[in-house]
Amino acid sequence: GPTSSIYRNDRNNKFVDINAEFPGVDYGIGRWNDYDNDGDLDVIISGNESSGRVITQLFRNDNGYFNFVDIGFTNLKLSDIAWGDYDNDGDLDFAITGETQGGKFESKLYKNENDGLFSQTFPDFIPVRSGSVDWGDMDHDGDIDLLLTGESAVGPVSKVYRNDRNDVFTDIQAEVIGL
């Protein structure tokens, strides 16, 4: 069945499984982050468990032990996740794309409220699955913009969304060919 593991580099050209109790997923993704700004890396996992249940779960790193944090994110498979501080408030927010248990495509943005909680913001991103999301300051204005690719209801798409601040993103209609 599907697995999710972390291997620690023991500095002797060997990697050792730390035996963290993460749910195994396929058709998904795992990403490092430091959402709580405590200097250690936390983990988010999204995908299909062996039972077929779709999950998106965040795990806080507490001195090398990973504890599930029940935030209530939308559960997605065929997903991608990109962390970035889109609102320039000093903490990591994230964009996520994928497909729900019911087959609905999603593209969501979660704002880190700096208190261990996240709120969903509602920019008009095209819903996709089986794609990629990434942040970068393409217009050099000091805030990060979003690149989003994947399979939409109308076929493959690639979009660039300019961050206009205050949770507003504008599709710049870039000449990007769908993948």
Functional labels for PLM-detected ranges:
Residues 35, 48-50, 86, 99-101, ...:
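Short polar/acidic secondary-structure junctions
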Residues 38, 42, 89, 93, ...:
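Acidic carboxylate motifs that coordinate Ca2+ or other divalent cations, activating on Asp/Glu
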